[in-house]
């Protein structure tokens, strides 16, 4: 809000200013998407508040917030570039803002609008599905043409304990996060059918004939290998636990 209220005071190229405004609007809309998605009615603040104003805000309806998000993104999309030069990698593009907008429509079950939005991304001609699924989450996958939005990181610079929180105890971590079984069940069989429909699914061998991305997404007890070590769940855990 502070940026948008003051950027017009800066002497700079008008076209560059339009792009920067679009970036900030996209980021603000993205934040409001998650607020409304998680909490429903939330205060919609679009200006810099005084202390008194901040202490007296009230929640706006989710419908109002979602309408704001959609309008902001649609305005931003018009001014964002399709691609960026290498030195600007990580800054939001037209495809990134369209991706956020499509996600909003999916969350709101506005299926046709979501479909039309994702079709616009496809028509940009700059994105493609990357077959290197595992690499998308490590340094090797940086600059993949599958990415719509990226959050850049500095290699080997640890400013918090997230690595320990996520890793299993076998590798010195705390294993605080585990996926739900519902996520595992969402991976279809190799015939493209859900597990409750596919004749290939065997509940006695639930990881066979499954979408290969499954075992690249979750660690399975006595199945997955990481850094040359077999993953074995903690003896006190549920025997079907995932990581």
Language-model-detected regions and their locations in the chain:
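Short coil/turn linking the two alpha-helices of tandem helical-hairpin repeats
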Residues: 8, 36-44, 49, 84-85, ...
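Short, solvent-exposed coil/turn linker segments
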Residues: 8, 50, 61, 93, ...
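Glycine-rich, histidine-containing beta strand-loop boundary motifs that form or position
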Residues: 28, 33-35, 46-48, 133, ...
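Conserved, well-structured interaction surfaces
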Residues: 1-39, 54-67, 73-87, 203, ...
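An aromatic- and glycine-enriched ligand-binding surface/loop that stacks and positions planar moieties
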Residues: 42, 74-80, 91-238
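Intrinsically disordered, low-complexity repeat and linker tracts
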Residues: 69, 214, 240-242
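Short, solvent-exposed loop/beta-turn-alpha elements that line the ligand-binding surface or hinge
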Residues: 52-54, 233-242
